[in-house]
A protein has these predicted regions:
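Short catalytic-loop micro-motif centered on adjacent basic/acidic residues
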Residues: 49-52, 72-75, 132-135
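C-terminal capping/lid region of NAD(P)-dependent oxidoreductase domains
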Residues: 122-123, 127-136, 144-164
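Adenosine-nucleotide cofactor-binding segment
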Residues: 1-58
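Short conserved AdoMet
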Residues: 44, 68, 154-155
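Glycine-rich phosphate-binding loop and adjacent beta-alpha segment
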Residues: 2, 11, 58-129, 162-164
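Short, hinge-like loop/turn segments at secondary-structure boundaries
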Residues: 15-21, 37-38, 90-94, 115-119, ...
Length: 164
């Protein structure tokens, strides 16, 4: 899911089959159920194999409820602010796994695997198989502008700081 129609459009342009626009997110039990139902309705197999969640907070439980049998829920971060509390019985009911993805630790603990991953990504980039979306390039001395732009959720893609 994404927070705006503009971001949904970009996701579809980059190959997403469908996108859920969550706006300000589920703020109570009823809206959380609605969000979960909407996510489930977009799945073609009764739930998702993998959920990539960099947001957390009130989005986590509805997202997890939309996971399919033996799905994996990847905890990437907590951009929405609060660390979520998931009912652990959902893992049992769905035969699902919750996996913490901490790239910083991975790069140090699994150096060779990380090196291979970077080489694979560079190959995809050089072959044109993936194309990063750069929303804006900002001079390094204006880094505060970049931080504010990201903080206001006004970015679609990446902000790149450049040296003059």
């Amino acid at each position: 899911g994404v927070s705006t129609e503009e971001k949904a459009k970009v996701c579809k342009e980059y190959g997403a089959d469908d996108v859920v626009v969550y706006g300000n997110g589920p703020t109570d039990k009823d809206s959380a159920k609605l969000f979960s139902s909407e996510l489930k309705s977009k799945s073609t197999k009764g739930g998702y194999d993998i959920i990539y969640d960099p947001i957390g907070d009130c989005y986590a439980e509805p997202a997890f409820r939309s996971i399919g049998w033996k799905g994996k829920y990847l905890v990437i971060g907590f951009a929405a602010g609060q660390i979520p509390k998931l009912p652990i019985n959902l893992t049992l009911l769905k035969g699902a796994s919750i996996v913490g993805v901490f790239w910083g630790a991975f790069t140090g603990r699994e150096f060779e695997e990380n090196k291979k991953n970077i080489a694979d990504i560079n190959s995809l980039l050089s072959n044109g198989d993936i194309k990063p979306l750069i929303s804006k390039k900002i001079p390094m001395e204006d880094a505060i502008e970049a931080i504010n732009l990201i903080g206001s959720r006004g970015v679609v893609g990446k902000v790149v700081l450049v040296n003059k």
